[in-house]
Amino acid sequence: MQILLANPRGFCAGVDRAISIVENALAIYGAPIYVRHEVVHNRYVVDSLRQRGAIFIEQISEVPDGAILIFSAHGVSQAVRNEAKSRDLTVFDATCPLVTKVHMEVARASRRGEESILIGHAGHPEVEGTMGQYSNPEGGMYLVESPEDVWTLNVKNEGKLSFMTQTTLSVDDTSDVIDALRKRFPKIVGPRKDDICYATTNRQEAVRALAEQADVVLVVGSKNSSNSNRLAELAQRMGRTAFLIDDAADIQEAWVKDAACVGVTAGASAPDILVQNVIARLREFGGGEAVTLEGREENIVFEVPKELRVDVREVE
């Protein structure tokens, strides 16, 4: 059985930054550090940080006065941000800069009185945070998930309308929704480049290349990870059997026993150690040496806040 690895896969710059913010805060200030929502959607990462003293909460009211609070990589609404400001808290923002860019687009539309449409998944924390940047009662902020949603949407003024997208969507599905928006609202204005982030796009391209050769595709990522789910869906759409797994223990031998080639990738919030564990598990089932496919090089780095720019090893 051949083992192929997608390239790129795993951590993106936004996830790296968010995890570093929590790790550095723990090193500098000590436990406990409070984090609103899971800092990234990966069980292994969250459990690891929890063991080191991070406390994950959903409501600002759960945080005691004087504590350190970190916003997750998914971002928060202005209401949450203002609630935190009203408290005696030291706040660090781990929102991915590419999510912040979308927040700024929404806030700009709100100030101008333009109505805005967000393409995204209802209930996802990034969507809640992005929708929460809009505050103009004269306008409107709407969420659509599919072309069908677009055709049933009514707005106040089609002449002052813009759209944005969640950063972790399927490139193909989003393109279909954007096409529907432009047909229904010919004057709608969108970003110069859609808001789906480079890491999401690159990992979807890598899965396409992987699925062209693999019989079975294993996507390492947690069930609540939007970008990981999109990778599994894309492989399935290409006619491959695909499984979303948290770690190597999830793999059933029956999934791969008849496969000549198994492809492995990881969502943007999944650490490489989980991929290495999957490779080891597949080798127990008769897999050969893992081969990494050629792919797009990523060298983007997002800096942590200056107050947290320390060498954790020196602090420890």
Curated annotation (Swiss-Prot):
Tell me which residues bind (2E)-4-hydroxy-3-methylbut-2-enyl diphosphate: H41, H74, H124, T167, S225, S226, N227, S269
A biological process (GO) annotation for this entry? Answer: terpenoid biosynthetic process
What cofactors does the UniProt entry give for this protein?
Answer: [4Fe-4S] cluster
Provide the binding site for dimethylallyl diphosphate. Answer: H41, H74, H124, S225, S226, N227, S269
Provide the catalytic activity annotation: isopentenyl diphosphate + 2 oxidized [2Fe-2S]-[ferredoxin] + H2O = (2E)-4-hydroxy-3-methylbut-2-enyl diphosphate + 2 reduced [2Fe-2S]-[ferredoxin] + 2 H(+); dimethylallyl diphosphate + 2 oxidized [2Fe-2S]-[ferredoxin] + H2O = (2E)-4-hydroxy-3-methylbut-2-enyl diphosphate + 2 reduced [2Fe-2S]-[ferredoxin] + 2 H(+)
Catalytic residues as annotated in Swiss-Prot or TrEMBL: E126
- A molecular function (GO) term: 4-hydroxy-3-methylbut-2-enyl diphosphate reductase activity
Binding locations of [4Fe-4S] cluster: C12, C96, C197
Entry similarity comment:
Belongs to the IspH family.
Q: How does it assemble?
A: Homodimer.
This one is known as: 4-hydroxy-3-methylbut-2-enyl diphosphate reductase
The gene name on file is: ispH
